[in-house]
Amino acid sequence: MCDEEVAALVVDNGSGMCKAGFAGDDAPRAVFPSIVGRPRHQGVMVGMGQKDSYVGDEAQSKRGILTLKYPIEHGIVTNWDDMEKIWHHTFYNELRVAPEEHPVLLTEAPLNPKANREKMTQIMFETFNTPAMYVAIQAVLSLYASGRTTGIVLDSGDGVSHTVPIYEGYALPHAILRLDLAGRDLTDYLMKILTERGYSFTTTAEREIVRDIKEKLCYVALDFEQEMATAASSSSLEKSYELPDGQVITIGNERFRCPEALFQPSFLGMEACGIHETTYNSIMKCDVDIRKDLYANTVLSGGTTMYPGIADRMQKEITALAPSTMKIKIIAPPERKYSVWIGGSILASLSTFQQMWISKQEYDESGPSIVHRKCF
């Protein structure tokens, strides 16, 4: 227990889920939704100990009477008061540690506004009084977790997807591409296409039900047109899902139409390229000499890459785009849902990393802008 005293805390604040734990562990101790819920109705029973806000799983379990808000949208914190509540909940209720006793490693999406990391830094030092902190890029951590120093990471979470090419440990910033299309957009899209089937989901609480349907039943088709034809001609692809009130709904082609939007963003009315093309474009922005290594080390990471069939589809799509002789390998580790956190745990426990922390002293001397100098 004694090394627990100084263990760094690793907090991967995703748009959808917050993953937190201790550096050196092989999995996060706490995984909970990045949600803050506030009551929609007036409390009438005195002495119930009702709170004015609920965080994480507690908000999720009381969602029927709450308005749920996600303080992180597209990887960027949009509500700092709620974000502080989530961090407070992480330290004091989930990990049960005093943040002033541990260095804290936070993560963020690449190409985030600079003000975002400055504010994160400021809150850590001024509100939580951490002795040291660091902000790492999510995709870089995923590559660490896969045991590579070269590769291109497609990291797709709930709020943002991005492709980050890394060569011998150096991220290539000019070739990083960001796509604001991820899990939450797919949940919204599934809500929309289920409405066409006559099932109406509208409230923030019902969106969580749709998210569950998405996670349990959706998959990526290898050939979309062919799959659509199969779905139209037989009921072999239909699955049923029981809602919390016992009502059973049936979904068919929605199962693969929903994640297809990752490959065809036009389904969502977006002009962007799909994840396969974004990955290819990212590789093409790199030096011609290193492309071969990137094609052979394409690493998937994040919860939105968990759909069955996504790796095979990526392999097929990138093979079609790349030169015909190129060897293409898509790496989809089974733990990729948490690979950002695992990478953070590895990084924060390296002896060589210890001089990289931003200390309270450095912060006091330079202010929040120190984060741009010390963190990539």
Swiss-Prot record:
PROSITE patterns: ACTINS_1 (PS00406), ACTINS_2 (PS00432), ACTINS_ACT_LIKE (PS01132). Its EC number is 3.6.4.-. The modification Methionine sulfoxide is found at residues 45, 48. The keyword Cytoplasm applies. Belongs to the actin family. This is Actin-5C. It comes from Drosophila melanogaster. In Drosophila there are 6 closely related actin genes. The gene is Act5C. GO terms for molecular function: ATP binding; hydrolase activity. One of its GO terms (cellular component) is brahma complex. The modification Tele-methylhistidine is found at residue 74. Gene3D superfamilies: 3.30.420.40, Actin, Chain A, domain 4. It is found in: Cytoplasm, Cytoskeleton. The lineage of its organism: Eukaryota, Metazoa, Ecdysozoa, Arthropoda, Hexapoda. PANTHER family: ACTIN (PTHR11937).
